C-alpha cells in the first residue's frame, strides 16, 4: 500500500481540507521523515565494507514510500550513498513476509544460498529470508527488555503527561538505544543504570547546569553543591562530565534542623516525623539525656516510644535553653565543615544545592543557620523532583526549582512518585553512613546498616549510569541528537522513564531490586523492606483497594509491592495515583446480606446479620466485627451461600478501640491458612467447593488485645452464583 492510498482515507472535511490537500499531507509527512531519520553508523560501516569488497549491496524494505522517495530518504541520511538494487514493498504489492524476497531473487538472478539479509524485524526479515533460503542476520533496534520499557514509558507518558505529543522526544530514546547497543553483555544491574537511571540523571545534570547559569551575573560568585547522601550519584556524574569544581556536602534533615534551632520547635517538628525512637538514639541525635527524658522512655515497653509521643512531651522534658546551646555548638561545627568542603565558601554569593528533592527542608534549615550566623549567601535549590507548594515560604532572596515540577506532572502524580522514591534513593545513595555530626571540619557518620550485597548492587547500577553519562554526549553529536535542548520536553520524558521504573517495574526488576532495604536513618538504625506483596493483599482484603493504594510506609516501594501481587493490580495502583481510578467502578458495593454464626467460649451460639460486598474486580468481601465482651471463640462463615465455589484470598484481622479505629487500622494480620477449618467444603490450596448447602468456613478467634476486632474474608466466586 502506498502513502497516497493511506491518505485517501484521511477525514479531510473534519480539518477543513479537501481531497486536493492529499499531496500536501504526503509531502508534509515525508519532510518530517527526512528531518527525523538518522543513519545507523555501525550498519553504514558494514554496508560500505561489503560494497568495497565487491559484493552487490542494496535495500529491501516494507514501506509505504515508493522507491523514489525511499532513495531520497536514504541519501538525505547519507549523501552520495549508492546501491545495486532497491525494493519498496508498495511498488510490488507484497512485503518481505510473503513475495518480496522472491521478486528480488528472480529479478536480480541471485542464488538464495549466496545471499545475505540483515534486518530488525524477526518475523518479516528473519523468518521471511529463511523461507526463501536467504541467510539472515537479526539486528534488533533494541533489546527485548529495552523495547518493553519503551512501551511502558509511552503508556505512562500519555497517562501522566496528558496533552504532550508522545512521539516527540528529541531523540532521547534513540540515544538510549544507541548507547545500550555499545554496552551489550553487561550485568542486569549495569544495564538498568545504563538504560534507565543514566538517561534521567544525565538530563538532570543539564538542568543543574542551567540553574547555575541562571544564578550567574555581575558581582556574583556561584558555587554548586550536591547534598549527601542522595546527591552522591549526581555529583559523580557532574565530575565525569565537567570536571569543574563542585562540592559534595554531607548534611541531612536531622543535622540541619537541629543546627537551625533557636527555639524548641525545630526539634519537635523533627521528632514528630520519627516512627519509633529509644533513649540511646535520642542521645545520639541531641547529645544530651536529661533525667526527665530518661524517665519518659522508661515508661514505654522496651524503652521505645513513638516520635509523635516524644514530640508532644518534649517541651516539658527539656529546658529550651539547653536546645539553643546545643544548636549553637552544632552550627559552629557545621560551618567549619562547610568552609573546608565548599571551595571559596566565604567569597561565595550564591550556593546552588542539588538533590533528588523534595520540599527543600535542608535548604530552608541552612537559610535559618546562615541568618543566625550573619551569612548573606543566597541559596538556590535544584531538585530532580519538587513539591512546589512547599517553596512558598522560601526567603525572598532564595529560590528553588524542580526538574520534574508540578508543571510537568500533576501534584497527585508527584506524590505517588515520591511515595515510591525510596528505591531511587537507595540506588543513588553513597555507600557511607549518614552524617551525625562534625569534628574539626571532618564528618562523623552513623553506622551503615545496609548489607554489603546491597551496596555492591547499587555500585553496579551507578556504574551503568556513569557509563551512559560518559558516552551520551559523543553519541548524540555523532547522530545529530539533542534530547535535552528543551527543558520541558526532557523533563516529561524523564518523568515517564523514572515513573516506569518506580511505578510499573518489570518482573526481573522486582527480582533484582526487591531484596533492597531502606535505611530509614531517622531515629533508628533499622532497615525497612522495599517490597511486601502480602502486605498489599492483606490491605485490599481488610480495607479495600483505595485504602491499600494510600497505605503508609513500610513497605517503602508500594508500587513494587502491588506489582508483586500482579501486573494488573500494579496498573490499578498507577491509575489511582494519577487520579484516573473512578471509585464508583472499583470500590465496593453491597451484594447482599448473609447470616454468620458466632460461637462463644461458653458454648452459646447466635446468628448475626452481615453484609457481603462486591468489588469492581468481582471479588466478594465480608467483614465481621466483634467486641471483646462478646467472648466469641469461633466464626462460621456460610461460604456455600456466599459462593459455593471460589478462591479464598485470605482472612485478616484488625483491632482498635472502637469500630472506626479497627476498620481504619493499617495493622492488618493475616490468619494462617492452617488455622482455618472447613466444614462440608472441599479445600485444595486457595480453591474450595462446598459439598453441601450448609458448607462453612470456620475461623478460630484469636485472643483480643483491644476492644474491637474485625475479621475480613476475601473470595473470588467461581462457577454459578448461589440461588
What is the role of each PLM region?
Residues 1-28:
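A metal-dependent, Asp-based hydrolase signature
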Residues 622-646:
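Extracellular beta-strand ligand-recognition surfaces/modules
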Residues 108, 112, 116, 127, ...:
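Long, low-complexity, Lys/Arg-enriched
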Residues 68-102, 257-260, 387-396:
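Extended hydrophobic/aromatic segments used for targeting, binding, or gating
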Residues 17-18, 34-40, 68, 77-78, ...:
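A generic "structured core" feature
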Residues 22-75, 85-90, 225:
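Substrate-recognition element of Asp-dependent hydrolases with the DxDx(T/V) motif
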Amino acid at each position: 500500500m502506498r502513502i497516497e492510498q493511506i491518505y485517501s482515507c484521511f477525514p479531510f472535511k473534519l480539518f477543513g481540507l479537501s481531497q486536493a490537500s492529499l499531496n500536501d499531507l504526503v509531502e508534509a509527512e515525508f519532510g518530517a521523515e527526512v528531518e527525523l531519520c538518522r543513519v545507523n553508523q555501525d550498519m553504514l560501516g558494514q554496508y560500505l565494507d561489503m560494497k568495497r569488497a565487491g559484493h552487490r549491496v542494496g535495500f529491501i524494505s516494507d514501506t509505504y514510500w515508493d522507491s523514489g522517495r525511499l532513495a531520497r530518504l536514504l541519501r538525505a541520511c547519507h549523501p552520495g550513498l549508492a546501491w545495486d538494487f532497491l525494493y519498496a514493498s508498495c511498488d510490488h504489492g507484497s512485503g518481505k513476509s510473503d513475495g518480496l524476497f522472491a521478486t528480488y531473487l528472480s529479478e536480480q538472478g541471485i542464488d538464495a544460498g549466496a545471499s545475505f539479509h540483515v534486518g530488525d524485524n524477526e518475523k518479516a526479515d528473519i523468518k521471511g529470508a529463511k523461507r526463501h533460503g536467504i541467510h539472515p542476520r537479526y539486528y534488533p533496534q533494541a533489546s527485548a527488555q529495552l523495547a518493553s520499557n519503551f512501551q511502558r514509558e509511552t503508556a505512562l507518558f500519555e497517562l501522566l503527561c496528558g496533552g504532550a505529543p508522545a512521539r516527540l522526544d528529541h531523540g532521547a530514546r534513540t540515544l538510549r538505544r544507541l548507547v545500550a547497543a555499545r554496552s551489550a553483555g553487561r550485568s542486569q544491574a549495569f544495564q538498568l543504570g545504563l538504560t534507565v537511571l543514566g538517561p534521567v540523571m544525565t538530563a538532570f545534570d543539564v538542568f543543574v547546569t542551567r540553574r547555575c547559569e541562571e544564578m550567574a551575573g555581575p558581582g556574583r560568585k556561584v558555587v554548586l553543591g550536591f547534598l549527601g547522601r542522595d546527591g552522591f550519584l549526581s555529583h559523580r556524574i557532574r565530575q565525569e562530565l565537567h570536571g569543574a569544581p563542585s562540592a559534595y556536602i554531607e548534611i541531612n534533615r536531622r543535622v540541619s534542623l537541629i543546627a537551625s534551632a533557636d527555639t524548641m520547635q525545630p526539634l519537635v517538628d523533627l521528632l514528630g516525623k520519627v516512627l519509633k525512637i529509644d533513649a540511646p538514639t535520642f542521645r545520639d541525635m541531641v547529645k544530651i539525656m536529661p533525667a526527665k527524658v530518661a524517665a519518659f522512655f522508661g515508661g514505654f515497653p522496651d524503652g521505645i516510644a513513638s516520635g509523635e509521643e516524644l514530640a508532644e512531651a518534649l517541651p516539658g522534658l527539656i529546658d529550651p535553653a539547653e536546645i539553643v546551646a546545643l544548636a549553637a555548638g552544632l552550627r559552629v561545627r557545621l560551618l567549619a565543615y562547610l568552609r573546608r568542603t565548599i571551595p571559596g565558601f566565604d567569597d561565595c554569593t550564591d550556593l546552588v544545592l542539588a538533590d533528588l528533592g523534595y520540599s527543600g527542608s535542608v535548604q530552608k534549615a541552612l537559610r535559618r543557620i546562615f541568618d543566625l550566623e550573619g551569612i548573606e549567601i543566597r541559596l538556590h535549590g535544584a531538585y530532580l523532583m519538587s513539591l512546589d507548594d512547599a517553596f512558598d515560604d522560601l526567603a525572598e532572596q532564595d529560590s528553588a526549582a524542580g526538574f520534574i515540577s508540578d508543571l510537568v506532572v500533576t501534584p497527585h502524580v508527584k506524590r505517588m512518585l515520591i511515595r515510591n522514591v525510596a528505591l531511587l534513593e537507595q540506588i543513588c545513595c553513597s555507600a557511607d553512613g549518614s552524617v551525625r555530626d562534625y569534628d574539626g571540619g571532618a564528618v562523623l557518620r552513623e553506622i551503615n546498616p545496609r548489607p554489603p550485597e546491597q551496596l555492591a548492587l547499587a555500585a553496579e547500577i551507578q556504574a551503568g549510569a556513569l557509563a551512559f553519562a560518559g558516552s551520551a554526549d559523543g553519541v548524540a553529536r555523532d547522530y545529530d541528537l539533542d534530547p535535552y535542548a528543551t527543558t520541558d520536553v526532557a523533563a516529561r520524558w524523564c518523568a515517564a522513564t523514572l515513573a516506569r521504573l518506580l511505578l510499573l517495574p518489570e518482573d526481573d526488576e522486582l527480582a533484582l531490586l526487591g531484596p533492597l532495604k531502606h535505611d530509614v536513618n531517622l531515629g533508628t538504625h533499622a532497615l525497612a523492606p522495599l517490597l511486601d506483596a502480602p502486605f498489599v493483599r492483606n490491605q485490599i482484603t481488610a480495607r479495600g483497594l483505595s485504602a491499600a493504594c494510600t497505605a503508609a510506609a513500610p513497605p517503602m516501594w508500594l508500587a513494587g509491592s502491588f506489582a508483586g501481587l500482579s501486573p494488573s493490580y500494579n496498573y490499578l495502583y498507577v491509575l489511582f495515583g494519577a487520579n484516573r481510578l473512578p471509585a464508583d467502578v472499583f470500590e465496593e458495593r453491597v451484594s447482599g446480606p448473609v447470616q454468620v454464626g458466632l460461637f462463644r467460649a461458653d458454648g452459646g451460639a447466635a446468628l448475626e446479620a452481615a453484609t457481603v460486598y462486591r468489588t469492581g474486580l468481582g471479588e466478594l468481601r465480608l467483614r465481621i466485627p466483634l467486641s471483646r465482651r462478646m467472648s466469641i471463640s469461633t466464626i462460621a462463615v456460610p461460604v456455600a451461600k456466599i459462593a459455593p465455589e471460589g478462591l479464598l484470598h485470605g482472612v485478616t484481622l484488625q483491632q482498635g478501640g472502637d469500630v472506626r479505629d479497627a476498620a481504619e487500622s493499617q495493622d492488618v494480620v493475616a490468619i494462617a491458612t492452617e488455622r482455618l477449618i472447613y466444614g462440608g467444603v472441599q479445600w485444595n490450596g486457595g480453591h474450595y467447593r462446598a459439598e453441601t448447602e450448609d458448607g462453612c468456613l470456620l475461623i478460630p478467634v484469636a485472643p483480643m488485645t483491644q476492644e474491637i476486632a474485625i475479621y475480613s474474608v476475601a473470595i473470588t466466586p467461581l462457577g454459578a452464583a448461589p440461588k
